[in-house]
Design a protein with these regions (language model features):
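Amphipathic alpha-helical polymerization modules
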Residues: 1-62, 118-172
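Cysteine-poor, low-complexity segments in flexible/peripheral regions
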Residues: 64-125
């Protein structure tokens, strides 16, 4: 799924931050480019469509949820609208995740990546190292945040499957 792929990319970015926080300067330009690529891959995944519908935009399904500017500042264009399916008498289930939920609800993944890029490109080695190291905890928290959203989505899927099976048995 797109959230699983985003999770793997954030994990990769966190590992780069850990590796680069040692203060070695010669690999920083390459690492900065790797983080820029990860940023753009996450942006592309966050803008995933199912048919003609952006899946992380809330109710704004015809709008790409995220854009970025040249300075790696991301803007969210979706909303926090829930999509719900009625599964029984007075029972409905939320069946979507928004980009805000997945990527900005606690830690703003895009801001953390931008700050990591800034640290990797900082001409002052000590300041750059401090900024890189400062992104390790936000990256760890972002991983927890994404895992929680993935777990919620998996739980919803299981609940929908259970309801479907119950309805199929009821019809027999």
């Amino acid at each position: 799924s797109c959230l699983e792929a985003i999770d793997e990319l954030v994990l990769e970015a966190r590992q780069i931050a850990v590796d680069q926080s040692s203060g070695e300067l010669e690999n920083r330009p390459t690492a900065a480019q790797e983080i820029k690529n990860i940023y753009d891959q996450i942006l592309q995944l966050a803008n995933t469509k199912l048919g003609d519908t952006y899946i992380l935009s809330g109710h704004q399904t015809d709008t790409a949820p995220f854009t970025r500017d040249a300075n790696y500042n991301a803007t969210y264009h979706g909303d926090d609208g829930d999509k719900r399916i009625i599964v029984g008498d007075k029972l409905d289930i939320k069946v979507n995740v928004t980009g805000e939920d997945a990527l900005r609800s606690g830690v703003d993944v895009f801001d953390a990546l931008r700050d990591l890029i800034s640290g990797l490109e900082d001409p002052n080695p000590a300041a750059g190292t401090a900024q890189i190291a400062a992104q390790i905890t936000p990256m760890s928290n972002a991983l927890d945040q994404i895992k929680a959203v993935r777990a919620e989505a998996a739980s919803t899927f299981t609940q929908l499957e259970t309801t479907e099976n119950q309805l199929a048995n009821f019809k027999l």
